[in-house]
Swiss-Prot record:
Entry keywords, A to Z: Cytoplasm, DNA replication, DNA-binding, DNA-directed DNA polymerase, Nucleotidyltransferase, Transferase
UniProt-listed Gene3D superfamilies: 3.70.10.10, DNA Polymerase III, subunit A, domain 2
EC number(s) stated in the UniProt entry for this protein: 2.7.7.7
Assembly and binders: Forms a ring-shaped head-to-tail homodimer around DNA which binds and tethers DNA polymerases and other proteins to the DNA. The DNA replisome complex has a single clamp-loading complex (3 tau and 1 each of delta, delta', psi and chi subunits) which binds 3 Pol III cores (1 core on the leading strand and 2 on the lagging strand) each with a beta sliding clamp dimer. Additional proteins in the replisome are other copies of gamma, psi and chi, Ssb, DNA helicase and RNA primase.
Protein family (similarity comment): Belongs to the beta sliding clamp family.
Pfam family, one: DNA_pol3_beta
Reaction catalysed by this enzyme: DNA(n) + a 2'-deoxyribonucleoside 5'-triphosphate = DNA(n+1) + diphosphate
Underlying gene: dnaN
Biological role: Confers DNA tethering and processivity to DNA polymerases and other proteins. Acts as a clamp, forming a ring around DNA (a reaction catalyzed by the clamp-loading complex) which diffuses in an ATP-independent manner freely and bidirectionally along dsDNA. Initially characterized for its ability to contact the catalytic subunit of DNA polymerase III (Pol III), a complex, multichain enzyme responsible for most of the replicative synthesis in bacteria; Pol III exhibits 3'-5' exonuclease proofreading activity.
Enzyme class: transferase
Localization in the cell: Cytoplasm
Organism (species): Lactococcus lactis subsp. cremoris (strain MG1363)
GO molecular function: 3'-5' exonuclease activity; DNA binding; DNA-directed DNA polymerase activity
Record-given protein name: Beta sliding clamp
Amino acid sequence: MIKFSINKTAFQNALKITKQAIGSKVTIPALTKLKIEVEEKGITLIGSNGQISIKNFLPADNKDASMLISGTGSVLLEAAFFENVVSQLPEVTLEFIEKEQKQVLLTSGKSEITLKGLDSEIYPHLQEISEGSSLKMKVKVLKEIFTETVFAVSTQENRPIFTGVHLETLSTGELKAVATDSHRMSQRLLPLEDTDLKFDVILPSKSINSFKNVFTNDEEEIEIFISGSQMLFQNETISYYSRLIEGSYPDTNRLIPNEADYTLDLVFDAAQLRHTMDRARLLTVMTTNGTVKLTVSGDSVVTTANSPEVGSVHEELTALSKEGNDLSISFNPEYLIDALKVIKAPEVRIRFISNVRPFTLQPRNEESGFVQLITPVRTN
């Protein structure tokens, strides 16, 4: 039967990470539980919501954990309640003792709390991924790619393939990450080190958002495996599984204009442009079409927004450079603000074809393989 003592902070941190995969709205009641497996070599915490699964291993020789294991076994505990109980324990160290009929006694200082557990045999078997070809990447790089694309996914569940980020290895030795909700698109290309792993998958946005909270050390390297309908991200102690979205992602390369198609090329200070859009948005949220108009005439660049109920906004913008024809185009400022949020460069390049064709954004003077596309709104 299980018996161990452990540093409360180390255990609590592991609990917090594992609980990222445990949800209250699940079809299988056992998935609201935390599975605890104790072996002589260490403690494994397991959580899953059917879409995301996390195995978090605390090795017995972890110095921060100050772990002492004197009994092994496994048990299920109500995840949310157990985490709250552990957080309220008074001392630095907690002791975990399994009693008869899967009851668990937690002691810390003068505090004793008894919890009702369940047999771990009722917990669903989690599909494993056999370790074969893999791709190694720094957490920081992967987070950047996800941040630069995930905001553009669709929130409409009736088109599931657009609710995730499309990840594909190309014959050019690059990783392509792209997301679109059909109104905007964000695409990032990243050169890869030598890898035999080839894939063309759609990773759900919910998995991406949880990933950022699970792998907190940006400088560490993780290994990526793919098998069938699952993707595995793994470091020395954490295995993070995600189900993939079924279906074929459309070819988004055809959406990106050819260089010869552009008729207007503008460069702006990214921060100034974002502040201008923020001010315009204050008014556009009060209008039915929610659009701002950008008018380029000679050396003049002006943004305007009008609301019969509230008023109007008129602001002159300074273009750092301008090449091409005059243009007047309307669009949703929210999309441009979201796009600018993920561009780290101080200057942004925006290129247009016409007032009814999508326009593109890229960091200026940066061959990063990062391009975004926004569809304009037709107005009378």
